């Protein structure tokens, strides 16, 4: 049985960030990725937004990691030359009954330490975004966009320069706690059984499945809930210069406008609860999406939109259930030395990745190395 020092399961942005943090701390790190390349799931199927920290309950892990991670991510991108823009975002109340919700998010943001939001007068937001129809709006100057692929490439480069290794096409099939860490059974073309003092489960959509396979007590394995979202791209030139977000809906942040680094506008994501990982783009999504967009952008009626992408959010609560916080469960929770499980890392996971990596790896920083 091959013996390793530290194993990270999952090479999405959070897994790569965690592996990088461990490697920079002097650990010998191996990343196991089930897919042929890094970031094939949520890390590359999202809006690529750097969130300010507006929506999340004060004191929650989402709030703390988002605000800290935002600043860390902006610094990291600037230092590494990763394409990003602090483009800003308008939060809009399309109707009068949404104004209290908008003001609630203003209060929430301030409680989270986001102190740069500004309530706009009508003439101000009309000057910023003439196509937007609303009754109230708030500007978030610290919201931005980032090239998530370039970010993952940079994190992987840091990991490899620090001596870490990425092994793709290597799904985790099973395992168990041992006296000095964990056994991990790895599939693929050349199945192998390994022993590692430290295992960090960043498997994203499959994190509950992997946790159970490694022997995590069932009481500490949340259910896997999948919320698929669909994005449509706006054909032709974008009328927007920044992101535009309506008031959130159940399961997501509403059908919002995002811009990529080339300036193309996309609308989405919507929410469709599914029971398995499936990236099919079903027909019939456009009409409902157009209705949602028209509430704050009436000009959508005269514009063509085309299917762009779909992604799946990893959730631990299903439809009709209260939204859940990020979960980072270490030995103090589940009782298995050397194991850290990350669950429900949906939005703002991209923004929070560097902060989550520090929090997760701190739980096993003192784990002994393999002799």
Which residues make up each language-model segment?
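N-terminal Rossmann-like FAD-binding beta1-loop-alpha1 element of flavoenzymes
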Residues: 4-31
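C-terminal lid/capping helical subdomain adjacent to the catalytic/cofactor pocket in oxidative enzymes
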Residues: 21, 25, 323-371
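Glycine-rich phosphate/pyrophosphate-binding beta-alpha loops
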Residues: 55, 143-145, 249-252, 339-353
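Short beta-strand to alpha-helix junction loop
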Residues: 57-68, 92-101, 138-157, 167, ...
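Helical element adjacent to the flavin cofactor pocket in flavoenzyme catalytic cores
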Residues: 138-198
